UniProtKB/Swiss-Prot annotation:
The keyword Transport applies. The gene is SEC61. Appears to play a crucial role in the insertion of secretory and membrane polypeptides into the ER. It is required for assembly of membrane and secretory proteins and is essential for cell growth. It interacts with other membrane proteins required for protein translocation. Upon binding to SEC62/63 complex, secretory precursor polypeptides may engage SEC61 to begin membrane penetration event. A cycle of assembly and disassembly of SEC62/63 from SEC61 may govern the activity of the translocase. Its main location: endoplasmic reticulum. GO terms for biological process: protein transport. InterPro entries: SecY/SEC61-alpha, SecY_CS, SecY_dom_sf, Translocon_Sec61/SecY_plug_dom. It holds the Pfam family SecY. Disulfide bonds: none annotated. Keywords: Endoplasmic reticulum, Membrane, Protein transport, Translocation, Transmembrane, Transmembrane helix, Transport. The lineage of its organism: Eukaryota, Fungi, Dikarya, Ascomycota, Saccharomycotina. Heterotrimeric complex composed of SEC61-alpha, SEC61-beta and SEC61-gamma. It is found in: Endoplasmic reticulum membrane. One of its GO terms (cellular component) is endoplasmic reticulum membrane. It is a multi-pass membrane protein. This is Protein transport protein SEC61 subunit alpha.
């Protein structure tokens, strides 16, 4: 693609909804207010059901993507942040691979790049809204009728436009951090909180039990005469959240928080000012949660395509090779899961017992996740502008060099460290995800990791802008 491709999007500028950037820095307290308001609007949208649905009780084809996309089925947040994330990742890929020439130091190029991203996100919103309705997620289109189908599409588009503007509001400096990260982490945290403290009751065949694991613990201790049996039931009950999952979630959260503090301090010095030294931190999670996001996106899309093909061509041998789908014990209620084929082997086990019963599948799954995360992490540094060559260029532009090394050797030294750190960090975050899935946390391993890294990122932003400098990770490490 030529750089002139961006000029094709210039006519759209006058017609796109836009949040005007603040003329002066927004005070920290006002940022907190705007962030809170944006979050409140998002949460409200996620609780309002779509008007006109005939039925949404079928197996959810987007089940594996919901947490990552901040999506709630059957609500205005059906699409979540999917159009924005998809558009952003595609354009970042095009830019990183030089298929789209963009000079980010040029204001006009930067603005056109943002316009192009927004236009593509809007097109995706229209496309996804139409597909979701016409594929029968809310009932057969013939049963819904033209008027209701159009109304459903309009509701989905309206909600997605609102999320797009909320994200832009925060990203342009009115709030803290990125709206996409905030909404995704909040959606995950909301689901975890609900599973831990839900006051609703469910009939499990032996009577009514509370859905929330913590509330169920106290309820069982109160009504059971045998307290030991009540504790065992509260910690290991099946098909409902249990206390073992609660403690597993807390353990994973603290582990990720602790590992955030692991970094290699690369000694650097200034080539312009004599005697000025410092360090360049290379974190263990050098690419943050991007590897597990990409791995999750890959597997989720394989699952989605496999399910759609199996529904239509269930007798085709090639389709069966990709995945055979159905319900089984231990799986989420009413949700179709892979029973054989490629999809089965890259699908996480539902429990430690499930993993032990099929060791070959477990080994393949673990190898796939660790390998994919390491590969994605190593590839992402080239796309995102954090590769050894990019960092070496930054050093040169800022008049920095590695202490004890010549300026001409900076790239070689960085090439020894950064790709290894990225691949190892990706494998570690993949291992944490696998561990989370095997332990059975309240939510998938991917969602727990995404929420934890995002929350810590927000803590760092708040610490920087709020004027307090206490490092949460170092403080936690001291306690450990």
């Amino acid at each position: 693609m030529s750089g002139r491709v961006l000029d094709l999007f210039k006519p759209f500028e006058a017609y796109l909804p836009e949040v005007i950037a603040p003329e002066r820095p927004v005070p920290y307290k006002q940022k907190l207010i705007w962030t809170g308001v944006s979050l409140l609007v998002f949460l409200v949208l996620g609780q309002i059901p779509l008007y006109g649905i005939v039925s949404s009780e079928t197996s959810d084809p987007l089940y594996w993507l919901r947490a990552m996309l901040a999506s709630n089925r059957g609500t205005l947040m059906e699409l979540g942040v999917s159009p924005i994330i998809t558009s952003s990742m595609i354009f970042q890929f095009l830019q990183g691979t030089q298929l789209l020439q963009v000079n980010m130091e040029n204001k006009q190029d930067r603005e056109l790049y943002q316009i192009a991203q927004k236009v593509f996100a809007i097109l995706l919103t229209f496309g996804q809204a139409i597909v979701v309705v016409l594929t029968g997620n809310y009932g057969k289109p013939s049963d819904l009728g033209l008027a209701i189908s159009l109304l459903l599409i309009f509701q989905l588009i309206f909600a997605s436009f609102t999320v797009l503007l909320l994200d832009e509001l925060l990203s342009k400096g009115y709030g803290l951090g990125s709206g996409i990260s905030l909404f995704t982490a909040t959606n995950i945290a909301e689901q975890i909180t609900w599973k831990a403290f839900a006051p609703t009751t469910v009939n499990v065949g032996r009577g009514q039990e509370f859905e929330g694991a913590v509330i169920a613990l106290f309820h069982l201790l109160a009504i059971r005469k045998d307290k030991k049996r009540a504790l065992v039931e509260a910690f290991y009950r099946e098909n409902l959240p249990n206390m073992f999952q609660v403690f597993s979630t807390i353990g994973v959260f603290l582990s990720v928080l602790y590992l955030q503090g692991f970094r290699y301090e690369l000694p650097i010095k200034s080539t312009r000012t004599r005697g000025q030294y410092g360090s360049y931190p290379i974190k263990l999670f050098y690419t943050s949660n991007t590897p597990i996001m990409l791995q999750s996106a890959l597997t989720s899309n394989i699952f989605l395509i496999s399910q759609i093909l199996y529904q239509r061509f269930s007798t085709n041998p090639l389709v069966k090779l990709l995945g055979v789908w159905g319900t089984r014990a231990g799986a989420p209620a009413g949700q179709q899961v892979a029973l054989s084929g490629l999809s089965y082997y890259i699908q996480p086990p539902f429990s430690v017992t499930d993993a032990l019963l099929d060791p070959i599948k477990t080994v393949v799954y673990v190898g796939f996740v660790l390998g994919a995360c390491a590969l994605f992490s190593k590839t992402w540094i080239e796309i995102s502008g954090t590769s050894p060559r990019d960092v070496a260029k930054q050093f040169k532009d800022q008049g920095l060099t590695i202490n004890g090394k010549r300026e001409t050797n900076v790239y070689k030294e960085l090439k020894k460290i950064i790709p290894t750190a990225a691949a190892f960090g990706g494998a570690v975050i993949g291992a944490l995800s696998v561990g989370s899935d095997l332990l059975g946390t309240l939510g998938s391993g991917t969602s727990i990791l995404m929420a934890t890294t995002t929350i810590y990122g927000y803590y760092e932003v708040a610490a920087k802008e709020g004027g307090f400098t206490k490092n949460l990770v170092s403080g936690f490490s001291e306690m450990m």
